[in-house]
Swiss-Prot record:
Family matches, as InterPro entries: GAGE (IPR031320), GAGE_fam (IPR008625)
Bias (Acidic residues): 29-40
Entry's family note: Belongs to the GAGE family.
Residue ranges with Basic and acidic residues bias: 97-111
Annotated spans, Disordered: 1-111
Protein name, as recorded: X antigen family member 3
Cross-referenced PANTHER family: P ANTIGEN FAMILY MEMBER 5-RELATED, X ANTIGEN FAMILY MEMBER 3
Pfam family, one: GAGE
SMART domains: GAGE
Length: 111
């Protein structure tokens, strides 16, 4: 017997959510108004010689940070290593040949 009734599936209409730019800035419950930044007292256009010195100093300070980050990443664990964590120290894992599996598979392995 073939049932050719009407399908009960009806797609739900899509709700239109306005983008965050149209809603406005989000405020924390304790914030009443966003605080405005004070205008800078120094000119933002340094002389060409000063700009180069500042850029070189910034590059020199960033390089050791990058090297430290790379060393930390190379030494950090990815989670794929087994038996090297603090929880695994001092534990001896049993060998698989010590267990005898029953034929039926319903019971627990015998040690």
């Amino acid at each position: 017997m073939i049932w050719r009734g009407r399908s009960t599936y009806r797609p739900r209409p899509r709700r239109s959510v306005p983008p965050p730019e149209l809603i406005g800035p989000m405020l924390e419950p304790g914030d009443e108004e966003p605080q405005q930044e004070e205008p800078p007292t120094e000119s933002r256009d340094p002389a060409p010689g000063q700009e180069r010195e500042e850029d070189q100093g910034a590059a020199e300070t960033q390089v050791p940070d990058l090297e430290a980050d790379l060393q930390e990443l190379s030494q950090s664990k990815t989670g794929g290593e087994c038996g090297n964590g603090p929880d695994d120290q001092g534990k001896i894992l049993p060998k698989s040949e010590q267990f005898k599996m029953p034929e039926g598979g319903d019971r627990q392995p015998q040690v």
